[in-house]
A protein has these predicted regions:
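C-terminal motif of bacterial Sec signal peptides marking the signal peptidase cleavage site
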Residues: 21-25
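Bacterial N-terminal signal peptides that target proteins for export
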Residues: 2-11
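Exported/periplasmic ABC-transporter solute-binding proteins
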Residues: 27-298
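Hydrophobic helical h-region of N-terminal Sec-dependent signal peptides
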Residues: 11-19
Length: 298
């Protein structure tokens, strides 16, 4: 009797365990799977790491003030970057870039074939266009000049303003020095106009920068010179060329005939920081700075 009771208890226990196992299994099969908690997507724009390091630029005195304005804006956004902008002229800029003495050279003209032959890895980055105005002392009022007349004046063939509709006064020519990008562009666009290759008169008063040219013309009677649009102000008189006023808008619409590219030059692909600076120059913000005095390329 005792053995039978013990058997009943064992069977009852086994039945209870079986029912529990079945219940747990069903719960596991029918339970809704739970997903790991997810974070709300960020609405903030990813931020780029600020740049750091130093850049050196040298060359064209036309590009120099523009490059300085661009450098100031870039350094304001990247306080760990230092950019040194020097002058020296376009030829110096090209040579310095080719010899790797600067990160970026500056040239206010096209690069010469001879320069590409000497430095075959040069890469040219055009950042703007610039007009070249023909300016006179404030007392000299000219209704306009043709390119042919400008060519003859700077060649020393026309020597009196009365020959081009001005007052009876001897002309004193002011020019940039050899190696200047502004001079190189002027020689290409004006002195070689029409298939002729005339030389600038040896009597010209040579100056080493656009700023110096402007000062001499503003302060010296009966002078005439060529000057970057970026240096035009009320101190000198720009003459219309071929009937077109010397204005940025007229370069942009291709009616003003004397203009040239403003270039930055690297020896091969630019380094990382130089590329970042060039990218900034070509951005909407950089080109807005260009547009203050020059013609943007974007």
């Amino acid at each position: 009797m005792k053995q039978r009771r013990t058997l009943y208890l064992v069977l009852a226990g086994l039945l209870t365990l079986s029912l529990l196992a079945t219940t747990v299994g069903c719960q596991q099969e029918t339970a809704e799977p739970t997903e790991p908690p997810t974070e709300e997507p960020s609405t903030e724009e990813p931020t780029e790491e600020p740049e750091e390091g130093n850049l050196s630029l040298a060359g064209s005195t036309t590009v120099q003030p523009l490059a300085q304005s661009l450098a100031d804006a870039y350094m304001a956004q990247n306080p760990d970057v230092g950019i040194d902008v020097g002058g020296g002229g376009s030829s110096t800029g090209v040579t310095s870039a080719g010899e790797d003495t600067v990160d970026i050279g500056m040239a206010s003209r096209n690069i010469k074939d001879s320069e590409f032959e000497e430095f075959p890895d040069l890469q040219v980055h055009t950042i703007a266009f610039d007009g070249i105005a023909i300016v006179t002392h404030p007392d000299i009022q000219l209704e306009g000049l043709t390119i042919e007349q400008v060519q003859s004046i700077f060649a020393g063939e026309i020597t009196n303003f009365s020959e081009v509709g001005g007052p009876d006064a001897e002309i004193f020519v002011v020019s940039r020095e050899e190696g200047s990008g502004t001079r190189g562009a002027f020689e290409e666009l004006v002195m070689e106009h029409g298939g002729e290759e005339k030389l600038i008169t040896a009597d010209a008063n040579l100056q080493s920068s656009n700023g110096a040219v402007r000062t001499v013309v503003a302060e010296t009677e009966n002078t005439i010179a060529y000057l970057s649009f970026g240096f035009l102000d009320g101190s000198v008189n720009p003459a219309p060329i071929n009937g077109v006023e010397a204005e940025v808008a007229n370069v942009a619409n291709d009616t003003y005939p004397i203009y040239r590219p403003l270039n930055m030059v690297t020896n091969g692909p630019p380094n990382e920081l130089a590329q970042a600076f060039l990218d900034f120059i070509m951005s909407a913000e950089g080109q807005a700075i260009v547009a203050e005095d020059y013609i943007p390329v974007q």
